[in-house]
Amino acid sequence: MAGGKEPIEVKFRLFDGTDIGPSKYDPSTTVSALKEFILARWPQDKEITPKTVNDLKLINAGRILENNRTLAESRVPVGEVPGGVITMHVVVRPPQPDKNSEKQLANSPKQNRCGCTIL
């Protein structure tokens, strides 16, 4: 590896407990590149599927990792076992509602109906 730095072994834990990896990465790999790796290997059978890297958040040791940071900058060495696998959690950002559908909902007439039943 460049600069004699050891590769970092990482696995990605998805929201349902399944994993992608582990795989080894150069410490100079950016978080954005890791997200591209995850996106390319996202399981097809998942109900929730990210469309872009911006739909993904990576969390390591309780911190949300920034896209422009490298893996070396994002590491939290406390509690890591030398030569062990680092588990990063992957969160999929919910899809943003379409602005046009929001306006339609806001402009639609509200129906006042009682949902109560008196027995």
Curated annotation (Swiss-Prot):
Residues where Cysteine methyl ester is found: C116
Protein's name according to its UniProt entry: Membrane-anchored ubiquitin-fold protein 3
Topological category with respect to the lipid bilayer: Lipid-anchor
Source organism, top-level taxon: Eukaryota
Propeptide: 117-119
Keyword Lipoprotein among record annotations: yes
Record flagged with keyword Lipoprotein: yes
InterPro entries with a match to the protein in the record: MUB, Ubiquitin-like_dom, Ubiquitin-like_domsf, UBL3-like, UBL3-like_ubiquitin_dom
Residue ranges occupied by any Ubiquitin-like domain in the UniProt entry: 8-76
Role summary: May serve as docking site to facilitate the association of other proteins to the plasma membrane.
Cellular component GO terms, alphabetical: plasma membrane
Subcellular location(s) of the protein: Cell membrane
Natural source organism: Oryza sativa subsp. japonica (Rice)
Pfam families: Rad60-SLD_2 (PF13881)
Keyword line: Cell membrane, Lipoprotein, Membrane, Methylation, Prenylation
Gene: MUB3
S-geranylgeranyl cysteine lipid attachment residues: C116
